[in-house]
Amino acid sequence: MLIAYLMEKLEKFTLINKDRSRIKVFEPFEDVSKPSPSIDAMMISYGCVYKRASKPVMKGSRVETIEAARKEYKQLLDEGWKKTSIFRSYL
C-alpha cells in the first residue's frame, strides 16, 4: 500500500542499496511532445556512490511506465534497498 501511495503522489525519491554504493532516483516524466502534456511515466536514473560525503556519479537513466517503475521499486525494497534523502541536494 505504501508503494502505491508513493507512486500516486508522483514525487521524486531516491533509493540506496544495502552497501550504500548504488542509488536509483525515481521521478515523474512529463511527455511534452503531446498536445496536452501529462505524466504517465517515470524516469529512473541510476548511479554509484564512491564516498558518502561526495556527489553520486550518475551513470544513466531510462523512462518506464508507472506500472513498470512500481514493480522495480517493490523489487528493490524486497532486495533490501531503502528510501533516502541524503543526496537530495546533489540531484
What do these predicted ranges mean?
Residues M1-Q75, E79, T84-L91:
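Terminus-proximal functional modules
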